[in-house]
Amino acid sequence: MNVFSYLLDPAHWTGPQGIPMRLAEHVYYTALTLLFALVIAVPIGAWIGHTGRGGFLVVGLANGLRALPTLGLLVLIVGATGLGLIGPITALVILAVPPILAGTYAGLRNVDPAVVDAARGMGMRGREVLLGVELPNALPLIISGIRSSVLQVISTATIAAYVALGGLGRFIIDGLAVRDFPQMIAGSLLVAMLAVAADLLLAGLQKLVVSPGLRAAPGPRRLRVVPSKTPDAAHAA
C-alpha cells in the first residue's frame, strides 16, 4: 500500500482512529496551546514594550525557551505530572510563548515615538495610548509572531502521541511501531497540510485586522495614530 492508497482508503476516514478524529484532536491541542500562550505572552510583551523596561529579559527568555528540547521537556513534565494532557500542553506552551512574546515586544517598540507623543499631546493616558495607538500599530509584528508560533505548535504537537494521546502524531508513532511507512508518511503529510492551511488562514486574518496603510508601508516611520473617541481626547481637541 502506498501513501495515496492509505489516504484514499475509506476505512481510514471513519471511527475514533480515523483521519477526521485525529485531525480534530490535533487542532484542539493547537488551539488550547495557542490560547494559553496568548494569555501569557501578549500582556507581558505589551507591558515591556510599552514601558521599555526589561527588554533584555524578552530576548534572553525567548532565546532560552527556544533552545529547550521539547521532547526532553515533555519527559520531565510527564514524570512530574503523570500521563495526560497537562504534560504535552505545558511543553507546547513553552514552545509557543517566545515567538508571540518577541513579536509583541518588537511591535510596540517599533511604533514611532512621534506618534506616541502626538497621542499623549491629544490628552490620551497611558492605557489609552497602549490600547488605541501602540497595539493597533503593532499588529503586523504581533500576528507574525502568532503565525510563527502556530506553525511550530502544529509541527510539534505530534509529541502528544508519545504519552498515549491522540492527534496526527498517532499515525507517525503507530506506523513507526509496526514499520508501516505509508502510514507514517501520510501522517507527516497531514501535519504539513494542516500547517499550511493554518498559515493561510492567519494570513487572511491579518489582512482583515491590519489596516491597509500598515500593510502597504511597514516600518515605524509610517505608523499612524488610531482614532480614539475618548472624552479626554475630545476635550483636548
Q: Whereabouts are the PLM-identified features?
A:
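Cytoplasmic-entry segments and transmembrane alpha-helices of multi-pass inner-membrane transporters
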Residues: 44-77, 92, 102-110, 117
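Membrane-embedded alpha-helices of multi-pass transport/permease systems
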Residues: 39-44, 87-116, 139, 146-157, ...
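Short cytoplasmic-facing helical segments at TM-TM junctions of multi-pass membrane proteins
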Residues: 103-142, 168
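Transmembrane alpha-helices
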Residues: 31, 94, 127-159, 182, ...
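Loop-to-helix entry region at the N-terminal start of transmembrane alpha-helices
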Residues: 21-30, 78-99, 139, 183, ...
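Glycine-rich helix-loop "coupling/hinge" segments at transmembrane-helix boundaries
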Residues: 79, 156-185, 189-191, 210, ...
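Periplasmic/extracellular loop-to-transmembrane helix junction in inner-membrane transport proteins
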Residues: 1-34
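C-terminal transmembrane helix and the adjacent membrane-cytosol boundary/short C-terminal tail
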Residues: 52, 109, 113, 186-237
